[in-house]
Curated annotation (Swiss-Prot):
Transferase found in the keyword field: no
EC number: 7.1.1.-
InterPro entries recorded: 4Fe4S_Fe-S-bd (IPR017896), 4Fe4S_Fe_S_CS (IPR017900), NADH_quinone_OxRdtase_chainI (IPR010226), NDHI (IPR004497)
Name assigned to this protein: NAD(P)H-quinone oxidoreductase subunit I, chloroplastic
Enzyme class: translocase
Binding site residues for [4Fe-4S] cluster 1: C64, C67, C70, C114
Quaternary organization: NDH is composed of at least 16 different subunits, 5 of which are encoded in the nucleus.
Record's function text: NDH shuttles electrons from NAD(P)H:plastoquinone, via FMN and iron-sulfur (Fe-S) centers, to quinones in the photosynthetic chain and possibly in a chloroplast respiratory chain. The immediate electron acceptor for the enzyme in this species is believed to be plastoquinone. Couples the redox reaction to proton translocation, and thus conserves the redox energy in a proton gradient.
Cofactor: [4Fe-4S] cluster
Keyword check for NAD: yes
Gene from which this protein is expressed: ndhI
Major location (coarse): plastid
Key words, A-Z: 4Fe-4S, Chloroplast, Iron, Iron-sulfur, Membrane, Metal-binding, NAD, NADP, Plastid, Plastoquinone, Quinone, Repeat, Thylakoid, Translocase
Record organism: Spinacia oleracea
Length: 170
């Protein structure tokens, strides 16, 4: 008879423990009810990137001295720098500069080690194309600045919403 009583006691303890665990998880679920949604509706809303986000590389042709430090700093030797030595002034003249973003790993070493700061990382992350050859950007395509995400109308609306302002005050 005692084994049957201890079996009922164990069953009762396990039932109480399971009810407590269910109650705890339900309280956690209810605590998330007052929070703002984290998911963004991607094609209609854009992700606000962090300050140090490593997106597409921006290149300023006039600042480049064709030193090829970016090529040596790149772990995959990606930037293609074509230059010509001007014998009369004994300096290199940059002819072409290109980066293939289909191969780039966006490590940012080229930007970090550039002595003239002609390279910078932008907040542009929408680089998808149907043809991989379109991901090879020359100096003209690299020189275009993207539209800032914070200038987008939908992002400004989200940032100016009362819910976001209340969250910032807390």
């Amino acid at each position: 008879m005692f084994p049957m009583v201890t079996g009922f006691i164990n069953y009762g303890q396990q039932t109480i423990r399971a009810a407590r665990y269910i109650g705890q998880s339900f309280m956690i679920t209810l605590s998330h009810a007052n929070r703002l949604p984290v998911t963004i509706q991607y094609p209609y809303e854009k992700l606000i990137t962090s300050e140090r986000f490593r997106g597409r590389i921006h290149f300023e042709f006039d600042k480049c001295i064709a030193c090829e430090v970016c090529v040596r700093a790149c772990p995959i030797d990606l930037p293609v720098v074509d230059w010509k030595l001007e014998t009369d002034i004994r300096k290199k003249r940059l002819l072409n500069y290109s980066i293939d973003f289909g191969i780039c790993i966006f490590c940012g070493n080229c930007v970090e080690y550039c002595p003239t700061n002609c390279l910078s990382m932008t907040e542009e992350y929408e680089l998808s194309t149907y043809d991989r050859h379109e991901l090879n950007y020359n100096q003209i395509a690299l020189g275009r600045l993207p539209i800032s995400i914070t200038d987008d109308y939908t992002i400004r609306t989200i940032l100016n919403s009362p819910q976001t302002k209340e969250k910032a005050c807390d």
